[in-house]
UniProtKB/Swiss-Prot annotation:
A GO CC term assigned to this protein in UniProt: presynaptic active zone
Domain of life, per lineage: Eukaryota
Swiss-Prot/TrEMBL GO biological process terms: beta-alanine transport; gamma-aminobutyric acid import; gamma-aminobutyric acid transport; glycine transport; hippocampus development; monoatomic ion transport; neurotransmitter loading into synaptic vesicle; neurotransmitter secretion
Stated consequence of mutating residue 91 to T: In DEE114; uncertain significance
Name this polypeptide is given: Vesicular inhibitory amino acid transporter
Similarity remark: Belongs to the amino acid/polyamine transporter 2 family.
Stored PANTHER family: AMINO ACID TRANSPORTER, VESICULAR INHIBITORY AMINO ACID TRANSPORTER
Ranges facing Cytoplasmic side: 1-132, 226-265, 327-341, 405-438, 483-489
């Protein structure tokens, strides 16, 4: 009897030891300690299988314990971390069917939020990358020539690729090998990359970049409104700064916005109006096709001003900020890649044609905003439509910037820097309204003192556009999915990071130099 008892105890101990070793080996294998030989790789695969069986057995034991009323009532409940495979941050992954649960939280809203089709998602991306900032692309061709045209194509390819890899960073494989969505935003991806040492550093960096880009976008809308109105009515005794003040007075009610329902009704009309404007400009350019100056398109570049063109082109493609939210709200997320391909192909073709045709028409006389080159009668009509579009587009980035600021700095809790902007009944507090008004006034002051559309666009594209579209997505992709990437994917990510970094620094420096030079010229005048 004693021999039988010792034999059973020995078998149990051996089984427990083997399972523990298998579990630890499986965890080490998944953490990145790759095998050096084929035999070791097979061994790790067996360890993974044993690890899976071990966890499945634990889960079955728990289910049996819950279903048996006469079991050990005093037994201690298992810790959740023991029955869920933990990776990276230490938090258990959601179950395989929890994609909607992850997508339904965070910035996506609740489950009752209606999903959008691939066509609607493509329309949103088109609105972002086919906006009125294409008006500065002919100015980029002025300083870049044929290389500027190549960059329009290259930027489309790279931004499409980085958008896809950014979405790939939202997903991971669970213990069953199923790909599930474990993150819901750009900030969540950044925090995951900086965990565990600095779990919030990445999110703060992304938030700062988002705020800068959104606020600069608002400033550009005010700048272009003042510029267009001033050039539309040069006979009126109203300066560009005065037109900017008038535009800001119209925009001041944006401070009272609680949601974008009222503004969203005009988005389709604004987009259609913009396409009509582009068609009018291209039609006028085609009417002067016999005078096109093909010899003016250069194969060489202006070394000092070409980096500004890079920033302008990159800024016209920025859409990465809202791609995680957009993909999370799609009815068929599997169609995201196809949607990105077609939207960026269309944007590349339309931008390239618009920039080339406009530059061929006016050559060296091309201005920062191409509509300023149109004859007076046509320019006034087109510019009024563009000003209306700019004013109606302003609330979108403004509201997004306010939301980022409120979530980052003005939330109730111990981590918040300031108290919440809203009272308990959901009403906006007076000082919160004051801060919103101050943000509108800040965009006005920047537009007054730096009224240079193309230079500001190049500065923003070099500073935050390249960071959010090139640098961070490639860096996050390498950090989170390193073990699963093929060699050519690693090469693409590293190349994009290096090239993007060089273009970002050079573009920022030269845009800043251009602004300083323009400011000195205005001061002398």
């Amino acid at each position: 009897m004693a021999t039988l008892l010792r034999s059973k105890l020995s078998n149990v101990a051996t089984s427990v030891s083997n399972k523990s070793q298998a579990k630890m080996s499986g965890m080490f294998a998944r953490m990145g300690f790759q095998a050096a030989t084929d035999e070791e790789a097979v061994g790790f695969a067996h360890c993974d299988d044993l690890d899976f069986e071990h966890r499945q057995g634990l889960q079955m034991d728990i289910l049996k314990a819950e279903g048996e009323p006469c079991g050990d009532e005093g037994a201690e409940a298992p810790v959740e971390g023991d029955i869920h495979y933990q990776r990276g941050s230490g938090a258990p992954l959601p179950p395989s069917g929890s994609k909607d649960q992850v997508g339904g939280g965070g910035e996506f809203g609740g489950h009752d939020k209606p999903k959008i089709t691939a066509w609607e998602a493509g329309w949103n991306v088109t609105n972002a990358i086919q906006g009125m900032f294409v008006l500065g692309l002919p100015y980029a061709i002025l300083h870049g020539g044929y290389l500027g045209l190549f960059l329009i194509i290259f930027a489309a390819v790279v931004c499409c690729y980085t958008g896809k890899i950014l979405i790939a960073c939202l997903y991971e494989e669970n213990e069953d090998g199923e790909v599930v969505r474990v993150r819901d935003s750009y900030v969540a991806i950044a925090n995951a990359c900086c965990a565990p040492r600095f779990p919030t550093l990445g999110g703060r960096v992304v938030n700062v970049a988002q705020i800068i880009e959104l606020v600069m976008t608002c400033i550009l809308y005010v700048v272009v409104s003042g510029n267009l109105m001033y050039n539309s009515f040069p006979g009126l005794p109203v300066s560009q700064k005065s037109w900017s003040i008038i535009a800001t007075a119209v925009l001041l009610p944006c401070a009272f916005l609680k949601n974008l329902k009222a503004v969203s009704k005009f988005s389709l009309l604004c987009t259609l109006a913009h396409f009509v404007i582009n068609i009018l400009v291209i039609a006028y350019c085609l009417s002067r096709a016999r005078d096109w100056a093909w010899e003016k398109v250069k194969f060489y570049i202006d070394v000092k001003k070409f980096p500004i063109s890079i920033g302008i082109i990159v800024f016209s493609y920025t859409s990465q900020i809202f791609l995680p939210s957009l993909e999370g709200n799609m009815q068929q997320p599997s169609e995201f890649h196809c949607m990105m391909n077609w939207t960026h192909i269309a944007a590349c073709v339309l931008k390239g044609l618009f920039a080339l045709v406009a530059y061929l028409t006016w050559a060296d006389e091309t201005k920062e905003v191409i509509t300023d080159n149109l004859p007076g009668s046509i320019r006034a009509v087109v510019n009024i439509f563009l000003v209306a579009k700019a004013l109606l587009s302003y609330p979108l980035p403004f509201f997004a910037a306010v939301e980022v600021l409120e979530k980052s700095l003005f939330q109730e809790g111990s981590r918040a820097f300031f108290p919440a902007c809203y009272s308990g009944d959901g009403r906006l507090k007076s000082w919160g309204l004051t801060l919103r008004c101050a943000l509108v006034v800040f965009t006005l002051l920047m537009a007054i003192y730096v009224p240079h559309f193309a230079l500001l666009m190049g500065l923003t594209g070099s500073l935050t556009g390249a960071g959010l579209c090139f640098l961070l997505p490639s860096l996050f992709h390498l950090r989170l999915l390193w073990r699963k990437l093929l060699w050519h994917q690693v090469f693409f990510d590293v190349a994009i990071f290096v090239i993007g970094g060089i273009c970002s620094v050079s573009g920022f420096v030269h845009s800043l130099e251009g602004l300083i030079e323009a400011y000195r010229t205005n001061a002398e005048d």
